[in-house]
Swiss-Prot record:
PROSITE patterns: CNMP_BINDING_3. A motif (Microbody targeting signal) lies at residues 425-427. It comes from Arabidopsis thaliana (Mouse-ear cress). The active site is at D337, S359, Q409. Belongs to the C/M/P thioester hydrolase family. This is Acyl-CoA hydrolase 2.
C-alpha cells in the first residue's frame, strides 16, 4: 500500500478520527503490516503485544465467549482495533484470524501518536491556538458523538451564534470522515434558540460512505431537544472540468481599509453621526470577534438609516491556522453567518424602529480549496423579502479573484420583540 492509501484507511478507524490530520500522516509512516492465515493466532493470552493493531482486511475472533448471542460483539473486522493504547495497559486475550487477515500495527514506541490536545493540531497546545480554533474544538464523547461549548469570548448575541452551530456541527461531521474527503456542500436548519450556558451535544449519523463521496447528518442537542440540524456532503479531490463566470467586484484592497475595531473608534468621535448613536456605541460592551472584518464601503449610515440590501467586506481568521483544509472550511462556515442575514434588513431600517433578523436555514457550496486565515471577499446581496422572510445570497472570492464559496440563507425579518426564554421555538 502507498502512503495515501494507508492514510485513507486510518481515517476510517473510529479511534483515530478524533486526531488531527497531521497525526494520521505520522502514524501512516510508522505502522507495520502483518499478515495471518485462517486459524493463526494474532496474539496469545500470555504473549506481549507489539502495539496497537488496526484490521485492514479480514476478520478475527476474540476467544472466550461461548454464548451465541454475544459472539458477534467479539468478532473483529475492517477498521476495528485492539492492543496497546495510550495507557500502556497490556490486555490478556487470545485473538485468532477467522480468515486471511492483514493488520497494520502501530509499534508500542509510537503509541504516543494517539494522544492529542486538539482535534485540529497535535503540536500546539489548545491555549496557544487561535480563538476561532478553540471555539471549534470539540470533545469526542463516544463514537459519532461530540460535545461543544460556547466560550466566554465567543460571539453570542444573547444566544448561541448561528455560525457556531454551523462550524461546530461541520467539525463533528468532518471528524467522522477520512480526511482525504472534504466538505463540498452543506444545508442546515436552525430550529430552536441555543443556550450559551450549557454544552451542545452533536450526534453524527453516517448516511453514506463511498469511494469518492460521503454524507453525514448532524443533530445538535440541548436539554434533550434537537435545536439545529446539518446535512453535509464530502468529496475526495478529483480532476475535472473547470470554468468561472462570476467576477469579483472591484473593491479596495483590505490593507487600505479600517479594521472593525478602528472603525468603531472612528465612529464614536464622528460628528456626522447622531449623538445618541455615538453614545450607545461608546457605552456598549465591545468584545472583539475572532474574525477580522474590513468593510469595503464604510459609510455614515447607522442601524436606523435605510440603505441598499447589499454589502461587501473582507474577512479572515485572527491568528494562523494549521494546514488542515477541514479546519479552514469549518472556520469559513463559522464566519459566514456574521452580518449575513442582517443585510436583508437594510432597506427597512428607520429611526425609532428596532428590527431583528433570525436565521432560518443556511446553505454553502465550497468550490475550491481556501485558507480562512488569508483575506476572503464576502459579497452579500438580498434580492427579496416577503411575508417576514428575507432571502440573502453570498459569494466569497480569494484575492486572486477565484470564486471559492457560494451561500444562501433565509431569515426571519421583523420588528424586534422582547426575548423569549431559551429553548423556545425561533418562530
Amino acid at each position: 500500500m502507498n502512503t495515501e492509501s494507508v492514510v485513507e484507511f486510518l481515517g476510517n478507524v473510529p479511534l483515530l478520527q478524533k486526531l488531527p490530520s497531521s497525526s494520521l500522516k505520522k502514524i501512516a509512516q510508522v505502522v507495520v503490516p502483518k499478515r495471518y492465515g485462517k486459524g493463526d493466532y494474532v496474539v496469545r493470552e500470555d504473549q506481549t503485544w507489539d502495539g496497537c493493531y488496526f484490521i485492514l482486511q479480514g476478520e478475527a475472533q476474540v476467544s472466550g465467549p461461548d454464548e451465541e448471542d454475544n459472539r458477534s460483539e467479539f468478532l473483529l473486522k475492517q477498521y476495528d482495533y485492539f492492543g496497546v493504547g495510550l495507557s500502556g495497559n497490556v490486555h490478556s486475550a487470545d485473538i485468532v484470524a477467522m480468515s486471511q487477515l492483514t493488520c497494520l500495527v502501530l509499534p508500542r514506541d509510537h503509541c504516543h501518536l494517539l494522544e492529542t490536545n486538539s482535534i485540529w493540531q497535535s503540536d500546539t497546545s489548545l491555549d496557544k491556538c487561535s480563538l476561532v480554533e478553540r471555539i471549534l474544538q470539540l470533545d469526542p464523547l463516544e463514537l459519532n458523538i461530540f460535545r461543544g461549548i460556547t466560550l466566554p469570548d465567543a460571539p453570542i448575541f444573547g444566544k448561541v451564534f448561528g455560525g457556531q452551530f454551523v462550524g461546530q456541527a461541520l467539525a463533528a461531521a468532518s471528524k467522522t470522515v477520512d480526511f482525504l474527503k472534504v466538505v463540498h456542500s452543506l444545508h442546515s436548519y436552525f430550529l430552536l434558540v441555543g443556550d450559551i450556558d450549557i454544552p451542545i451535544i452533536y450526534q453524527v449519523h453516517r448516511i453514506r460512505d463511498g469511494n469518492n463521496f460521503a454524507t453525514r447528518r448532524v443533530d445538535a442537542v440541548q436539554k434533550g431537544n434537537i435545536i439545529f440540524i446539518l446535512l453535509a456532503s464530502f468529496q475526495k479531490e478529483q480532476q475535472g472540468f473547470e470554468h468561472q463566470e462570476s467576477t469579483m467586484p472591484s473593491v479596495p484592497d483590505p490593507d487600505t481599509l479600517l479594521s472593525l475595531e478602528e472603525l468603531r473608534e472612528s465612529r464614536i468621535t464622528d460628528p456626522h453621526l447622531p449623538r445618541s448613536y455615538r453614545n450607545k456605541v461608546a457605552t456598549r460592551n465591545f468584545v472583539p470577534w475572532p474574525i477580522e472584518i474590513r468593510f469595503c464601503e464604510p459609510s455614515n449610515s447607522t442601524n436606523q438609516t435605510k440603505s441598499p440590501p447589499r454589502l461587501n467586506y473582507w474577512f479572515r481568521a485572527k491568528g494562523r491556522l494549521s494546514d488542515d483544509q477541514a479546519l479552514h472550511r469549518c472556520v469559513v462556515a463559522f464566519a459566514s453567518d456574521l452580518i449575513f442575514c442582517g443585510v436583508g434588513l437594510n432597506p427597512h431600517r428607520r429611526k425609532g424602529v428596532k428590527s431583528a433578523a433570525l436565521s432560518l436555514d443556511h446553505a454553502m457550496w465550497f468550490h475550491r480549496p481556501l485558507r480562512a486565515d488569508e483575506w476572503l471577499l464576502y459579497v452579500i446581496v438580498s434580492p427579496t423579502a416577503h411575508e417576514t422572510r428575507g432571502f440573502v445570497t453570498g459569494q466569497m472570492f480569494n484575492r486572486k479573484g477565484e470564486l471559492v464559496v457560494s451561500l444562501t440563507q433565509e431569515a426571519l425579518l421583523r420588528e424586534a420583540r422582547p426575548p423569549k426564554p431559551s429553548g423556545t421555538s425561533k418562530l
